[in-house]
Regions:
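Short amphipathic alpha-helix that is part of the acyltransferase structural core
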Residues: 1-35, 39-54, 58-63
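Conserved acyl-donor/pantetheine-binding loop and adjacent beta-alpha core of acyl/acetyltransferases
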Residues: 58-97
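Conserved acyl-CoA
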Residues: 84-88, 112-126
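Conserved GNAT acetyl-CoA-binding A-motif
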Residues: 92-95, 119-133
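Conserved acetyl-CoA-binding loop-helix of GNAT-fold acetyltransferases
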Residues: 97-100, 105-119
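Conserved beta-strand-loop-alpha-helix junction that forms the acyl-donor binding cleft
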Residues: 98-105, 127-155
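Conserved beta strand-loop-helix elements of the APE1-like EEP
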Residues: 156-161
């Protein structure tokens, strides 16, 4: 049975996220990369199939400077974000990643994760970089397009931010 819930980004959760990421991002190998950025007070919305994590969505509070850099197209590679840009609390959020295991795609799981996020945090100023056509298509349902940076990369922001 598929369930979606919010969980803290503990080491255990980050190790599960890393396993999913390795399917798509083989260059992110070390758990220390995750631990340097995410803290237990950060959270993820995870999709579980009979208790096994099969997908996740992470959006974390960030400094306004990072939020603005994303919106302006200055920051387009989140691997290089200084971990000091992530905060414990902020009105600005950066949607770091949404990943669903290949075998579970096409079941609207990404939408369930984003529905859960926006149900809990309807007023957060959230930005993201869509780096694939699938990501772009998904983002269009929940965010407003700020700008296309290239054929595959686009900046989106929560609708309340772009169209107050």
């Amino acid at each position: 049975m598929l369930t979606v819930r919010e969980v803290s980004l503990t080491r255990e959760t980050l190790e599960e996220i890393r396993k999913i990421d390795l399917e798509f991002y083989p260059n992110i190998g070390l758990i220390h990369w995750y631990l340097s950025r995410y803290k237990p007070w950060h959270s993820a919305f995870v999709a579980l199939d009979d208790g096994k994590m099969i997908g996740y969505f992470v959006a974390v509070p960030v400094r306004k400077e990072l939020y603005d850099a994303v919106l302006n197209g200055v920051m387009v590679d989140d691997l290089g974000i200084n971990p000091d840009m992530y905060l414990q609390e902020s009105e600005y959020y950066y949607a770091v990643s949404i990943v669903i295991q290949e075998a579970y795609r096409g079941r609207n799981i990404s939408r369930q994760l984003l529905d859960a996020y926006f149900s809990k945090y309807p007023d957060k100023k959230t930005c993201l970089l869509a780096v694939s056509k699938g990501g772009h298509h998904l983002a269009e349902h929940y965010f407003s397009l700020v700008k296309d940076l290239s054929e595959n990369v686009a900046v989106f922001a929560s609708r309340s931010t772009v169209n107050p």
